[in-house]
């Protein structure tokens, strides 16, 4: 509690970005930071710190991957203005073809302002905010579960790694914190793995469970802001970064 009796909560999230970092160490690690920060401020919490826990191999390629991953983590955190307060790094030959990149973030939020990733009322609106949708990260979630063949990184694999825009993320962060403080929304969800498709399904699923209802949602793909012409199926599963789905009243 604060001096005036206001109750606060700490938000903590941690996730891995292993395969993307192996394929493209700079963007893979940077987007890992971006994703974990969005997990924090979609709850209405302001991120106050980042930590990273790294495991890399000992061969020449692994050292190059490590150096670029650290640069990506540092760049994204510095641009957004959230300090990296610690972590650890170890090397071992067992990580030569499978580095481990775990990123953790901490945030703080007033208890009364916590936002959950759900839709609770009929006729609520799903509002898309943030970056335009592109072909970045198509099949990224599936790629993260695959095994590399002969340790080769193909152009197709590289296209599965998302591109980062930390300056846009900073704008999203501030907007979401303001939304939280003013209690303007019913729910909010980051568009992470699986993109718009998974984000909308998760929002509806949680809403159904909380309200014991059979609610669903309609998505108008022709209204989604896109960078260029895209197939509707790709719009649904794109993992372009810095995008959110907000649940609000009209």
Regions found by a protein language model. Give the residues of each.
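Glycine/proline-enriched, intrinsically flexible loops and inter-domain linkers
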Residues: 1-250
């Amino acid at each position: 509690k604060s001096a005036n009796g206001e109750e606060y909560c700490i938000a903590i999230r941690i996730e891995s970005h292993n395969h993307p970092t192996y394929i493209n160490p700079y963007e893979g690690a940077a987007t890992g930071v971006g994703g974990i920060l969005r997990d924090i401020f979609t709850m209405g919490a302001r991120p106050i710190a980042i930590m990273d826990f790294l495991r890399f191999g000992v061969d020449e390629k692994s050292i190059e991957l490590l150096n670029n991953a650290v640069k990506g983590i540092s760049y994204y955190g510095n641009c957004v203005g959230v300090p990296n307060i610690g972590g650890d790094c170890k090397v071992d030959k067992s990580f030569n073809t499978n580095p481990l990149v775990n990123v953790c973030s901490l945030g703080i939020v007033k208890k009364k302002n916590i936002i959950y990733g759900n839709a609770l009322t009929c006729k609520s609106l799903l509002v898309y905010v943030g970056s335009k949708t592109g072909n970045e990260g198509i099949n990224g979630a599936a790629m993260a579960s695959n095994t590399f063949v002969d340790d080769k990184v193909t152009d197709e694999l590289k296209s599965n790694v998302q591109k980062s825009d930390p300056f846009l993320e900073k704008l999203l962060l501030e907007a979401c914190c303001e939304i939280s403080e003013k209690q303007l929304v019913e729910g909010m969800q980051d568009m992470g793995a699986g993109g718009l498709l998974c984000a909308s399904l998760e929002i509806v699923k949680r809403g159904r469970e909380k309200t014991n209802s059979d609610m669903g949602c309609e998505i108008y793909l022709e209204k989604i802001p896109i960078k260029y012409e895209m197939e509707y199926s790709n719009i649904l599963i794109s993992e372009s970064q810095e995008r959110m789905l907000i649940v609000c009243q009209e």
